[in-house]
Amino acid sequence: MPRPEKVQLVAELTDRFASSTAAVLTEYRGLSVAQLNELRRALNGDAEYTVVKNTLSKLAVRNAGLTELEPLLQGPSAVAFVRGDPVKAAKSLRDFARANNALVIKGGILEGKLLSAAEVAALADLESREVLLAKVAGAANAVLARAAGLFQAPLAQVARLAEALRAKQAES
């Protein structure tokens, strides 16, 4: 019979998996407590980094309906539960992994889709949501400005033609 503490912990993990926009699984073997705390600070509120027992995590991912994560839960595992921008969190994890070879990104899940370690790295290479939205807005603005110029050109030509006709009539 499971202990009440473990039942509660599985329920909390299930809730975190279900409510997070993304979750990135890592192997932290060889990292000191100070380095883990440094990683938590680097995530800067975009994600909550938690060291988890694999048996409890497997129960939680089953309960959350994310069974595709089970094969990644081997060896010393920790999970970054992303609440904010997944791109920022992936960048923070990638940068920390580059600086500390002991951190290995195993993979993750984003909005219900399983991500390999390479896909998490590709996510980290994306620009943030704000930058992408600014680029879309800039492109839309350029198209609208070009369209406005096209609509204004015939009006300007008509005005020049009317002025030329008026000048010609004034001469005659």
Swiss-Prot record:
One of this protein's GO BP terms? translation
- Extract the PANTHER family matched here: 39S RIBOSOMAL PROTEIN L10, MITOCHONDRIAL (PTHR11560)
Q: Which UniProt keywords apply?
A: Ribonucleoprotein, Ribosomal protein, RNA-binding, rRNA-binding
Say what the protein does. Forms part of the ribosomal stalk, playing a central role in the interaction of the ribosome with GTP-bound translation factors.
The record's comment on protein family reads:
Belongs to the universal ribosomal protein uL10 family.
Question: What CDD domains does the annotation carry?
Answer: Ribosomal_L10 (cd05797)
Give coiled-coil spans as residue ranges: none
Which InterPro entries does this one have? Ribosomal_uL10 (IPR001790), Ribosomal_uL10-like_sf (IPR043141), Ribosomal_uL10_bac (IPR022973), Ribosomal_uL10_bac_type (IPR047865), Ribosomal_uL10_CS_bac (IPR002363)
In the record, which residues are listed under signal peptide?
Answer: none
Keyword Ribonucleoprotein assigned to the entry: answer is yes
**Where on the tree of life does the source sit, at the highest rank?**
Bacteria
Looking at the UniProt record for this protein, which Gene Ontology cellular component terms does it annotate, in alphabetical order? large ribosomal subunit
Please state what the protein is called.
Answer: Large ribosomal subunit protein uL10
Query: Could you describe the subunit structure of this protein?
Result: Part of the ribosomal stalk of the 50S ribosomal subunit. The N-terminus interacts with L11 and the large rRNA to form the base of the stalk. The C-terminus forms an elongated spine to which L12 dimers bind in a sequential fashion forming a multimeric L10(L12)X complex.
Annotated Pfam families: Ribosomal_L10
- Say if the entry is tagged with keyword Transferase: no
Gene encoding the protein? rplJ
